[in-house]
From Swiss-Prot:
Lineage: Eukaryota, Metazoa, Chordata, Craniata, Vertebrata
Enzyme class (EC, first level): oxidoreductase
Protein's name in the database: Protein AMBP
Family: In the N-terminal section; belongs to the calycin superfamily. Lipocalin family.
Lipid biosynthesis listed as a keyword: no
């Protein structure tokens, strides 16, 4: 019941993660009630997350590949065939993954490196997508992990790409090591690329914007604008962690806290109230009352005073405010359309 984890393995020329993280991953949770037969068939590898230095060096050359899983030669195996572009030539790789006593966990032996990889199907709905995690130990890199996203079709919903990014980050995989594959189309083994196109480069997850003002370019994660997720109902996700995160509440026009489980969920999920507000707040926030909140943090911020028609400084208590709260005078004026050249910061 771990066929998908297998595909994960064949593209693991570089499995990675921080050594100290991978060493503490003995209890990886596989897909609940995993059904092996439903994982069979064709999958497209659409994204990968890894901290392996080698992968980071070649990520611009990576492109979508396919993987076919089916019954193996024996009941103890799953057959795998992967097709991908490699160095301008369409390459096909076949192998077998060994089942274990845990449904959803597979082993794959790399004779070239004399190592055994462990692959786990951590989340799937079988007919649309699957997320696999692979662990490896090598004398060169030490213990490592790699996370991969597969789809039944060459394209997936943008929300799933965001969810994959969140899972990868929660596993300790750096933002610059999350790669969304370029789609060069399927290939026939032995075919050669006609002409590599510069624009067909791997899509990278983009770091959240750091600009204080709200007039900068929209935040983008992978291929989806983060602000497109602001109207989603927040999701704790299926995991059991208790991380305090912020979500945007369109009714109250405020960013509120919730407990995030640590995986999946959706894009309405922010590490800080500031990031949440600067991504999701609208100009309607300028008409809200100025709220200090019940907490006593005494943070100097800016808000728009509708009665005076200008931005003023106020003391924010640190909790239970609303969207009429800005981190510089310039940001307040940009949002609320106040003329002037003030540029004071808190």
């Amino acid at each position: 019941m771990k066929g998908l984890g297998t595909l994960f393995l064949l593209l693991t020329a570089c499995l990675a993660s921080r050594a100290d993280d991978a060493a503490t991953l003995p209890d990886i949770q596989v897909q609940e009630n995993f059904i092996e037969s439903l994982i069979y068939g064709k999958w497209f590898n659409l994204a990968v997350g890894s901290t392996c230095p080698w992968l980071r060096r070649i990520k611009d050359k990576m492109s979508m590949s396919t993987l076919v899983l089916q019954e193996g030669a024996t009941e103890a195996e799953i057959s795998m065939t992967s097709t991908r572009w490699r160095r301008g030539v369409c390459e096909e790789i076949s192998g077998a993954y060994e089942k274990t006593d845990i449904d959803g966990k597979f082993l794959y032996h790399k004779s070239k490196w004399n190592i055994t990889l462990e692959t786990y199907v951590v989340h799937t709905n079988y007919d649309e997508y699957a997320i696999f995690l692979t662990k490896k130990f090598s004398h060169y890199h030490g213990p490592t992990i790699t996370l991969k996203l597969y789809g039944r079709e060459p394209k997936l919903r943008d929300s799933l790409l965001l969810e994959f990014r969140e899972v990868a980050l929660s596993m300790g995989i750096p933002e610059n090591s999350i790669v969304f594959m370029a789609d060069k189309g399927e290939c026939v083994p032995g075919d050669q690329e006609v002409k590599p196109s510069p624009h067909l480069r791997a899509r990278r997850a983009v770091l959240p914007q750091e600009n204080e003002g709200s007039g900068s370019e929209p935040l983008v994660t992978g291929i989806l604008k983060k602000e497109d997720s602001c109207q989603l109902t927040y999701s704790e996700g299926p995991c059991l962690g208790m991380m305090e995160r912020y979500h945007y509440n369109g009714t109250s026009m405020a960013c509120e806290t919730f407990q995030y489980g640590g995986c999946l969920g959706n894009g309405n999920n922010f590490i800080s109230e500031k990031e949440c507000l600067q991504t999701c707040r609208t100009v309607a926030a300028c008409n809200l009352p100025i709220v200090q909140g019940p907490c006593r943090a005494y943070i100097k911020l800016w808000a728009f005073d509708a009665a005076q028609g200008k931005c003023i400084q106020f003391t924010y208590g640190g909790c239970k405010g609303n969207g009429n709260k800005f981190y510089s005078e310039k940001e307040c004026k940009e949002y609320c359309g106040v003329p002037g050249d003030g540029d004071k910061t808190n």
